[in-house]
C-alpha cells in the first residue's frame, strides 16, 4: 500500500525532485510475514531514573544500579512475568512470550528470573522478524506499539507508573498520542 503526502506543490517539485522511498522501519514489517508464530512480544521502555549514571570515561555506557531489584519497575515487571494468568495463556494456547528489553535495560536482564514460557530476545535476532512473527505486543510506553498498529496487530498496555513516567524525571513527555 503506497502512502504519501498530497500537498506538495507540483508546479515546483516533480517526480525528478522527489523520490517515493517509504520509511525503512515500517517497510521491513511486511517482509516474511508468512513465518507467523504463536508468540506475544513483551517490550517495556527504559526508565532514566533507574538505569545508573554514565561511566566517567564512557558516555555511552552506564554504571549498574545495584538497587535495581528494589525499584517499582523491577518489582512490577517481575510480578507480571510470574502472573498465573500469563502462565495459563502460555499453557492453554501454547504461546511463547518473547521479552525484548530496551537497550538501556539489557544489562538488567540478568536480574529477572524469567519463567520457561518467557524467552529473552537473542542478541542476533532482528527486531522486525520478532515483530512479524508476533501476534501482539504488551508494552508500556514504547514506540514499538506503532509498529504493531501499522500491521493491524493488537497492542496491550501495561502502564504501572504512568504518573511517575511523565512527571519530568524521564526523557519522555506527554504528546499528541493519548494512551487512554
Label each PLM-derived region with a short phrase.
Residues 23-25, 122-126, 160-164:
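Short, acidic/turn-prone active-site loops that include or flank metal/cofactor-
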Residues 3-7, 29-33, 52-53, 109-112, ...:
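A short acidic (Asp/Glu
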Residues 19, 24-111:
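Conserved catalytic-core segment of nucleotide-activated headgroup transferases in glycan assembly
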Residues 1-27:
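Active-site-proximal region of nucleotide-activated glycan assembly enzymes
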Residues 98, 103-146, 151:
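Donor nucleotide-activated moiety binding/catalytic core segment of transferases
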Residues 29-31, 127-133, 166-173:
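Short, charged, surface-exposed secondary-structure boundary motifs
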Amino acid at each position: 500500500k503506497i502512502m504519501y503526502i498530497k500537498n506538495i506543490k507540483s508546479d515546483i517539485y516533480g517526480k525528478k525532485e522527489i523520490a517515493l522511498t517509504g520509511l525503512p522501519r515500517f517497510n521491513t514489517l511486511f517482509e516474511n510475514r508468512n513465518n507467523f508464530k504463536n508468540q506475544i512480544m513483551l517490550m517495556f521502555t527504559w526508565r532514566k531514573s533507574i538505569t545508573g549514571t554514565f561511566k566517567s570515561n564512557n558516555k555511552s555506557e552506564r554504571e549498574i544500579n545495584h538497587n535495581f531489584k528494589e525499584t517499582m519497575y523491577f518489582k512490577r515487571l517481575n510480578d507480571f512475568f510470574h502472573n498465573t494468568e500469563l502462565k495459563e495463556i502460555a499453557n492453554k494456547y501454547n504461546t511463547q512470550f518473547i521479552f525484548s528489553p530496551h537497550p538501556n535495560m539489557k544489562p538488567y536482564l540478568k536480574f529477572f528470573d524469567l519463567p520457561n514460557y518467557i524467552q529473552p530476545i537473542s542478541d542476533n535476532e532482528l527486531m522486525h522478524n520478532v515483530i512479524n512473527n508476533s501476534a501482539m505486543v504488551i508494552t508500556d510506553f514504547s514506540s514499538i506499539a506503532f509498529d504493531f498498529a501499522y500491521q493491524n496487530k493488537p497492542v496491550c498496555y501495561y502502564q504501572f507508573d504512568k504518573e511517575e513516567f511523565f512527571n519530568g524525571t524521564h526523557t519522555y513527555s506527554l504528546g499528541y498520542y493519548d494512551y487512554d
